[in-house]
Amino acid sequence: MTNIRKSHPLLKIVNDSFIDLPTPSSISAWWNFGSLLGICLALQILTGLFLAMHYTSDTATAFSSVTHICRDVNYGWVLRYLHANGASMFFICLYLHVGRGLYYGSYLYKETWNVGVILLFAVMATAFMGYVLPWGQMSFWGATVITNLLSAIPYIGTSLVEWIWGSFSVDKATLTRFFAFHFLLPFIISAMVMVHLLFLHETGSNNPTGIPSNADMIPFHPYYTIKDILGLFMMITALLALVXFAPDMLGDPDNYMPANPLSTPPHIKPEWYFLFAYAILRSIPNKLGGVLALVVSILILIIIPLLHTSKQRSMTFRPISQCLFWLLVADLLTLTWIGGQPVEYPYVIIGQLASVLYFSIIIVFMPLVGLMENHLLKW
């Protein structure tokens, strides 16, 4: 008799995706982040659902409803801080996942990579709208500044901004629609994750060597389920430590002040995970140029498969490319730091240099170094 997990129409899909899935035997801990992202998404949907039961998306009561959740709802503070810090964990895993893809050449699975880039955009949009919901000072002014960037689009810009606002400023209509989209998008993201996995399972996973591993595959369960559970415990430990001991460490103190359209905070800045893109935006003195640089800084990931010049897939055996990759990481950390600093000397010039370096590494240096390594290896 056939095992039910292999014959049942629904269980068969689960079996082929998570149990009997042939997986390269050599994949390292860098391959843990996919499953961690899935768990982060599930955690965000669950905590978000319970928060939505107590939250009101009205400018008069939004701030009070968040305070009510923290003070009066049973374990409401746990839900709120799990959700807020869970977003930070989500982005840490997301950036490490993308970094892994860049380092090991996973972007050559073009369909999986492109769906992944769209997923990144969707998660960023969701996080931005979620940051507006508590209706604190930074929520209000962050929403005003970022949505206002669309006014840089020629001809239709101003109309587009007012259409998104639903008013002539960020107001009740804006908050209500942001709440609606913030609730809806994670479910769309979940569907896109399925597509992401569908494309991945068409080709199978990449591995650290970048060499096809068809001859050496092992079942996903129990080997990688156990390995993923270790990663899960480490992430949950970090998240709970953050929630229980330093819940506001990654937040902005200004967001504990109710939104006031008449008082601008001294330094308007987004959450830490958007600071690198914000620094690129600010480094260009022209509004339209800044907006284009901001969008291209993420959209550039789409063209990375086209910029791959090396005859090796992974960077494992390419030391010069490795140096360039870690320079890119250092550059992104520098941009993150600059994004949180005021617009004054020397931060402005550091931000501009880091922005130029960011685009130069990806568009110019990485393809050139790939060709150079081919030449050095006489390929």
Curated annotation (Swiss-Prot):
Pfam families xref list: Cytochrom_B_C, Cytochrome_B
Q: Which cofactor does it need?
A: heme b
Signal as a keyword of this entry, yes or no, is no
UniProt GO MF annotations: metal ion binding; ubiquinol-cytochrome-c reductase activity
The UniProt keywords, alphabetically, are: Electron transport, Heme, Iron, Membrane, Metal-binding, Mitochondrion, Mitochondrion inner membrane, Respiratory chain, Transmembrane, Transmembrane helix, Transport, Ubiquinone
Q: Where are the transmembrane segments?
A: 33-53, 77-98, 113-133, 178-198, 226-246, 288-308, 320-340, 347-367
Topology relative to the membrane: Multi-pass membrane protein
Subcellular location, record wording:
Mitochondrion inner membrane
Question: Assembly state and interactors?
Answer: The cytochrome bc1 complex contains 11 subunits: 3 respiratory subunits (MT-CYB, CYC1 and UQCRFS1), 2 core proteins (UQCRC1 and UQCRC2) and 6 low-molecular weight proteins (UQCRH/QCR6, UQCRB/QCR7, UQCRQ/QCR8, UQCR10/QCR9, UQCR11/QCR10 and a cleavage product of UQCRFS1). This cytochrome bc1 complex then forms a dimer.
Under the heading PANTHER family, the entry gives: CYTOCHROME B
Q: What else is known?
A: Heme 1 (or BL or b562) is low-potential and absorbs at about 562 nm, and heme 2 (or BH or b566) is high-potential and absorbs at about 566 nm.
Q: What name does the UniProt record give this protein? A: Cytochrome b
